[in-house]
């Protein structure tokens, strides 16, 4: 990462990853120690991020507690990462060479990015450092890619295109090609008797486009081109592939049967291998074990999951592990942030899933490497009619006690229910308590798992939280942490 982003931006990326790791407040010392920078630099980074991305990011500060990052409504932290990617010389060079924008211009990169020959050489060296494990390199003299495995190269280029933007948000110049990609995918689904998930279909569209671009440049899967796809004679497939247009020249990308056949061979291989994994016993068994472990911990039935969709996602992971066992993302971390969002909003579900990954059979233990991506799948595939269960499971029984009047007790109840939603079940309250009328024999005190009060009359109990008459954000944060800890402790072993 440090080779792709400059030193300051790389540190700012780690700062964002750390701050959104969970919803805990973090002290300046903890953050600076973790990032290995001084507190002055940390404050400068926070100031830079919240100023540069003021429409996206907010930083809150509480004395004696620390900092907390929040994303403004209607925005995503991904927007910052996408901005870095789209302004990165690393990605810009790879993109321009891929689309052959420099094909007829030796000075293209100097004139486009106003860089020196030394800078270009250094950046090419960085690119080759990252591409080496894929069997790829960028020739400095020709500024074109050398590729050992064209299938791997197309997977890389597809992933790179996805990393530059939202999977669903295509560049305006490629919108028509996106439509053609979806048409072709549907034809391939029918031919291979396979149905992709919605997310996989959107991802596949990028692989289709990148394959078309590579075939148009005559970078073929097979040097002799003797193998013919069974779909090359399909009129519909042929016409759709002829429709892909180069947005710069407005001419067709593919102009020959050889080029069309090459792209179809790539897609045939993709679909055949994907179908093998979709229908494999391994994908089925892994899905069943994972779902059963989670269902047991959530104290529910395995039928709450859409098994068919999960099998497809695990099948896709098996395909990727076999055909592209390399880094999928260099800067963007969609799966990570989506997983963190689930952790913050649905901590019990998150913990149940993570514990289940850690307890998988030895042969399946490697699947935990894909936990962030599958966390999102498992959440999406929990059937909608049962979502209420995710939020309400393991509610903590809370009793409120105050020395003030009944109105204050009701106000506290309102504040807690508003702040903690489904995390607690308030079973009752008492008011105007004194050392003379407070009784630990109150049956509700016995039933309660947590007692929140503004006095010490029940200090012999090990389940109290003492608050001030006016409850501040710091105390609400502490109560929230206590609730999450208690709810997680209730998970089935």
Residue ranges and their predicted role:
Residues 1-493:
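A cross-family "folded-core" feature that marks the main globular domain of proteins
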């Amino acid at each position: 990462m440090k080779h792709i982003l400059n030193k300051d931006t790389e540190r700012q990326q780690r700062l964002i990853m750390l701050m959104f790791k969970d919803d805990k407040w973090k002290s300046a010392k903890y953050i600076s120690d973790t990032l290995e920078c001084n507190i002055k630099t940390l404050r400068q980074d926070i100031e830079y991020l919240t100023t540069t991305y003021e429409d996206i990011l907010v930083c809150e500060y509480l004395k004696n507690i620390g900092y907390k990052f929040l994303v403004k409504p209607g925005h995503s932290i991904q927007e910052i990462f996408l901005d870095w990617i789209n302004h990165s010389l690393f990605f810009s060079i790879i993109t321009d060479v891929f689309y052959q924008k420099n094909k007829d211009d030796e000075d293209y990169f100097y004139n486009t990015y106003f860089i020196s020959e030394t800078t270009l050489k250094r950046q090419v060296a960085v690119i080759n450092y990252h591409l080496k494990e894929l069997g790829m390199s960028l020739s400095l003299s020709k500024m074109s890619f050398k590729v050992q495995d064209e299938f791997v190269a197309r997977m890389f280029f597809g992933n790179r295109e996805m990393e530059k933007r939202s999977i669903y948000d295509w560049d305006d110049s490629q919108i028509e090609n996106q439509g053609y990609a979806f048409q072709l995918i549907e034809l391939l689904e029918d031919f291979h008797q396979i149905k992709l998930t919605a997310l996989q279909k959107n991802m596949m569209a990028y692989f289709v486009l990148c394959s078309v671009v590579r075939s148009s440049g005559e970078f073929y899967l097979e040097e002799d081109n003797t193998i013919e796809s069974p779909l090359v004679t399909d009129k519909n497939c042929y016409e759709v592939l002829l429709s892909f247009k180069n947005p710069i020249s407005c001419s067709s990308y593919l102009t020959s049967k050889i080029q069309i056949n090459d792209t179809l061979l790539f897609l045939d291989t993709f679909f055949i291998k994907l179908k093998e994994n979709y229908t494999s016993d391994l994908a089925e068994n892994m899905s069943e074990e994972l779902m059963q472990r989670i269902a047991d911990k959530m104290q529910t039935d395995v039928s709450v999951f859409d098994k068919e969709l999960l099998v497809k996602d695990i099948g896709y992971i098996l395909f990727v592990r076999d055909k592209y066992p390399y880094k999928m993302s260099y800067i963007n971390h969609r799966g990570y942030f989506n997983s963190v969002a689930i952790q913050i909003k649905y901590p019990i579900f998150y913990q149940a899933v993570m514990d289940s990954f850690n307890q998988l059979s030895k042969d399946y233990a490697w699947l935990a490497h894909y936990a962030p991506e599958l966390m999102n799948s498992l959440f999406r595939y929990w059937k909608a009619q049962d979502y209420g269960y995710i939020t309400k499971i393991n509610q903590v029984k809370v009793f409120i006690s105050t020395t003030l009047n009944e109105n204050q007790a009701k106000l506290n109840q309102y504040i807690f229910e508003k702040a903690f939603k489904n995390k607690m079940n308030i079973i009752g309250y008492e008011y105007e308590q004194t050392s003379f009328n407070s009784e630990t024999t109150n049956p509700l005190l016995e039933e309660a798992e947590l007692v929140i009060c503004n006095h010490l009359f029940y200090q012999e109990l090990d389940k109290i939280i003492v608050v001030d008459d006016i409850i501040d954000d710091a105390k609400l944060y502490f109560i929230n942490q206590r609730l999450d800890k208690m709810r997680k402790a209730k998970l089935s072993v």
